[in-house]
Every structure is written in structure tokens, then in C-alpha cells.
Amino acid sequence: MQLVPTDDPDEKIGRTSNGMQNATLPIDGPVNTEPKDPAREQWSGKLDFLLSVVGFAVDLGNIWRFPYLCFKNGGGVFLIPYSIMVLLTGVPLFYMELCLGQYYRKGAITTWGRICPLFKGIGYCVILTAFYVDFFYNVILAWGLHYLYTSFSFNLPWASCNNSYNSPACYEPHWSEDGTAMCRSANQSVSAEKISAAEEYFYKGFLGLHEANAPNSHVIRSVTDLGNVRWDIALSLFVVYLICYFSMWKGIHTSGKVVWFTALFPYVVLGILFIRGVTLPGWQNGIEYYLRPNFEMLKRPSVWQDAATQVFFSLGPGFGVLMAYSSYNDFHNNVYVDALFTSFINCATSFLSGFVIFSVLGYMSCKSGKPIEAVAQEGPGLVFVVYPEALSTMPYAPFWSVLFFLMLMTLGLDSSFGGSEAIITGLSDEFPILKKNREVFVGCLFAFYMVIGIAMCTEGGILIMEWLIIYGTTWGLLIAVFCEAMVIAYIYGLRQFVHDVKEMMGFRPGNYWKFCWSCAAPFILLSMITSNFINYQALTYQDYTYPTAANVIGIIFALSGASFIPLVGIYKFVNARGNTISEKWQRVTMPYRKRPNQTEYIPIPTTQPHSDIML
């Protein structure tokens, strides 16, 4: 064999006379990944990285989704399937993505192109998923910002029924004259036909989704009739993007400092709100309801599905964020400890936030005389209706309201930073011209978000948001992460991946991690994908049913990100060098790595069998 140049300067490698690569490296052979990359910026400190990852993973879902899922799925017993899913899928995939980003030191697109060119489409899929999430996530932050600056008032607008949009069905919760709160008995409960001032403010006064002055909660908008733009929401969204831009335009050196506040401040507020919550009447009932175990619920597949879904959306594999953040680490950073630490913080925050939420729900049940299941809500209804209503009944209500919505803003901002950084890093590494003009690129990205976001600033904007939440994330995310696990286990090879980890940190992951990466995670992910397809239902929101066309377009939209995986794979295969299918397959399934004293990434096969798992 002799070394001959190829037409592609990035593919200089030994070849036989038929043009096929004939060089192989033993698994512990001299592959140099050039850990010192002077052109790659790095975190200015280890804590910048840890706080950025914690800030991304701990988001609004920890506050408004996990506690509700515990309540819905058997109370404390939900922690059993949740913990199992964390141990078998969440943490292993979290760890895997951090390792891949740190080893290849690039964003998702370039990293997957180097791991396995045939599956470079995984990188495009995860970037597109992060793109879809950013469309609606920052609108929720705009809502929080509106509530935050509106809270700087002696009279909170969601505490009163004296507004122009209020209906005769509106009621105001009150404290007693001596400053204490008395619990209502069942026969004193608020009528189910009544609508709280907080609910009317959110849906009628703020969003305009429900008809003003009407004594009901019927949706009056549709996806074909979104109504007028709510310019106060649009202005808030513009301010959110200004905050994001000036936090991210210079890269991780600016965002890495901002997260010192946005990642740590929520824990201060959660502690304060917990102390306040356990001083309210009825708090014990709320906590008991949150933790009361119902072991019969473990027999329901939906409980396990909810646990797995929460793990993936909470820890965040498949969004490209973990790869992007870890790509700025020192090559020999102990990402194993980082993965365990940040995963634990995330899961503990989810669990502890339940005490903050349900102590207040117990209080609301006490105040209204309604059972807790009639008070509890999931998603925006919890943080923009139920919790603000509870805070409005307390002495010094504006103070508590400012504190709560400032916490929501900080929780959401660093998660927004993560999603945007995944896109910026992924595209900048793949298209270097964007990296050279980062400030302009980031500005154009957020300007595009702002234009798209206007549709969700209309009176029916929440209908578009719900459509994006359902169709823009779940299927593409699950398919991408499933492909990630399968490629690492069965094409790239676990033995090679384990060697890469050893090269970085000096030790090999044990059999537990190999089992999770090769068996447990792919099986659970495939089960989730199958379940999502089998149990698919046409989308509804409150009493509004989405038209058939919206659901059909939604399904196409849901699969748009995942479609990049086969499309890019076909393109790579068709254009691969080689005279036979076997030669082309070898070309597109070999990882691109570096030899000693070379700067180019070249395709280098290994001698290890791809199916060799437990080694």
C-alpha cells in the first residue's frame, strides 16, 4: 500500500489500487484528537460550564410539569418509574452527549458527521428541534416578563373583578379581616360555575382567547382566525430577545457569566416560597396529596410513558445543547462527574419544587373549598393562573408576585440560552462564515424568531403555541435520540466510544453504562416512539378542536426534523467514494478522526467488531 493524495484535501489516507481505504487502527492505537485547539474558545471557569448545564436542564417544566405528573400518576409512587427512567435512559444519554461534545469539540451537526457520516442528519434533526422549541419558549418568557412588570403595582390586576373584561361569573379570593386565611368547608366551596379573577385576567384580559364579559371560558379564536396582535406581549417578546442577544452575542464568555445569576437565583426564591408555603393553612393537605402513594398506578403504561417523557424533556438529550456546551470544555475535563452532578441537581429540583407548588395548592383548596384535583393544573395554567391567584390573596401580594415571576424569568432565560447556543454552535461549526460574524448571525437569528413569534402574540397565539409544543418536539426528539444510541452502540461501536472516554478522562465506563447505551435506552426509546404513534389523538385545546388540516400539517411538521436523518444519509451514501455498495457503506460508516501530527479529520476504520457490546 502507498500513500496517494485524493481529490478531497480532508480525506488524505492510505488507499489500495481500487481507491478503498485499507488502513486500520487498533482500538488503542495512536489516534490524536488534538485536545489543545487554540481556535476553540473555552469556558473561563468550570463553574461557568456547570451552571450553564444546570440552568439549561432546570427550566419551567421542573416547576409546572413534574409536580403535576406526580399528583396525576400516583403521588410518591411516581418516583419509582421516574427514578428507573433516570437511571436507565436519562443520565446515560446525558453522559453520552457530554462525552461526544467534549471529545469532538464541535456542535451537533459536525460531531455526528465525524462520528458516522451516514447519520450526519441526526445533527440537523436535533438543531431543528431546538429551533422549533425556541419559537414558543421565548413567548412564554414574554408572558412572564409582562406579569413581572405588572406586579410592580399596589393592586394586582388578576386579583380584582373590577376590570372591563370581567364577567358576572368572576370571583375574588380574599383573606379574612384579621389577616388570616380561613378554610372553607365543602358546603361553602366556590361554585364550579364561577371563574377566578386570575383566570379571567389571563385568558380574557391578557391573551384575549376567551370572550370578554362572557360568563364562560369558551375559546373564541382558531388557528384560522388568530385575532389581533397583543402589542404588550409583542413588546415583552422584543425585550426578551434583547436580553438573549446581549447575553449571547459574544459567546460563552458573556452567557457563562449571566448564568451565575439566572441559574442560582431560582434556588433562593424556591427556598423562600417553600418557607412561605408551609406557613399557609391547608399546606399539609397539599403535600400529602403530592406524596400519597397509589401503587395501583404502576400497572398503567401511561405512568411509565409520562415518567420517560419527563426525563427526556427535563435532562435534555437530543436538543444539541449538551454537545454544544461540552465542546467548549478542556479535553481532559472529568465530564463523568459533571454528568452525575448536574443530573442529580435537576432531578432534586423537580422533586423539591413539588413541595413549593403543592403547599400552595393545598392552601388554594383550603381557601376555595374545592378538592385539590379541581385546583391543580398543568403547564401555563399553573404558573399564570393558580399560583398568581394564591399569591394575590397574601399580605404584600405584589412582593411575592415580583419574586415568583422573577424566578420564572431566570429559570426560563438560561434554558433559552442553551437552545439558542445549540443552534449557533451547531451551524457556526458547520459553516465557519457564521462563526466569523457571530454578532450578525445571532442578531439575524433572533430577528427571525421575533417575526415568527408575532403569530403567538395574537389573541389566538396560544393555539399556535400548543400546536408547536405537541408537533414540534416529541417525535423528532425521540427519533433523534434513538438513532444516537443505536449509532454509538452498533455502528461507531461501544468499544471505540469507551476508548474515547478513556483517552479523555483516563478510565473506561463500566458495564452498567454499556448496557444502558446499547440495550436499555434504545428499547425504552423505541417503546416511546411506538406508543406515541399508536396512541396519537387529534389535537385539542380546552373546548377548541383543531381542524383536520392542522393535524395533518402537524404530523408532517413533527417528522420534518427526523426526515433529515434518511435524506442526509442517502445523499452521503450516493456521493461516497467506492465502486460497490460495500465500499460506499464502509466509507460512510467510518468515523472521521485525526492521526498524530495531522490537522485534518480523515475516515479511519477500527479493527473492532461493531456488535461487540459488553467488553
UniProtKB/Swiss-Prot annotation:
Compositional bias annotation for Polar residues: 15-24
Highest taxon in the source lineage: Eukaryota
Glycosylation, residue list: N162, N187
Pfam families named among the record's database cross-references: SNF (PF00209)
Biological process, per Gene Ontology: amine transport; amino acid transport; cellular response to amphetamine; chloride transport; dopamine uptake; dopamine uptake involved in synaptic transmission; negative regulation of cellular response to manganese ion; negative regulation of cellular response to oxidopamine
Amino acids binding Na(+) 2: A57, N62, S314, N346
GO molecular function list: amine transmembrane transporter activity; chloride channel activity; dopamine:sodium symporter activity; metal ion binding
UniProt key word Lipid biosynthesis: no
Keyword Nucleus recorded: no
Residue ranges, annotated region (Disordered): 1-39
Deletion phenotype: Significantly reduces the learned avoidance of bacteria that induce mitochondrial stress.
Annotated PANTHER family: SODIUM-DEPENDENT NORADRENALINE TRANSPORTER (PTHR11616:SF320), SODIUM/CHLORIDE DEPENDENT TRANSPORTER (PTHR11616)
Miscellaneous comment in the UniProt entry for this protein: This protein is the target of psychomotor stimulants such as amphetamines or cocaine. Plays a role in promoting amphetamine-induced loss of motility in water, termed swimming-induced paralysis.
Name of this chain's protein: Sodium-dependent dopamine transporter
Organism: Caenorhabditis elegans
